[in-house]
Amino acid sequence: LEMASLGSKVLQIRAVEFAQKYEVPLRVLSSFEEGEGTLITTEYGADKTMEQALISGIAFNRDEAQLTINGVSDTPGVAYRILGPISDANIEVDMIIQNIAPDGKTTDFTFTVNRNDYQRGMEILQQTADKMGASEVSGDARIVKISLVGVGMRSHAGIASSMFETLANEGINIQMISTSEIKISVVIDEKYLE
């Protein structure tokens, strides 16, 4: 499910959701070569336990854009006041980062949206910034999200560390990080994708 939702384009996400919900095994086959492909089931082995972290795939999504609003007063409800108008415009938000400034009075808020919604999102965010007295609005439509997908990703610190080390060794700066039990995602400059 994570691979499909992250843009791997191997399976249609609704097919994966139904297979997961009703425990229907899925077999993924290559259209380029013969073979048995990959069988996706709910069983994890004879005892159905997951002892080790296992990377099952790497996915990327280049259809993302990043929006940032800086210098917003850090008060309860700030996330709603920023994302409410974005949601009202039917723009889906993916990754979110909120940083409190050292003065403890203001916050910076960054989030990602689909690249097709970038211009509209920037316009809405600028209107929101004007109402909230924010110091700056910025954006970047040249980003890509890279995700490692597998079992036990968050509970095995070595996986994230290895990913970050690999990117650092290649001189690639990480702009955003998101983790869950089954994925680690980073946002980087699009020029590093290939």
Where are these regions (language model features)?
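C-terminal catalytic "cap/lid" subdomain
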Residues: 1-179, 183-194
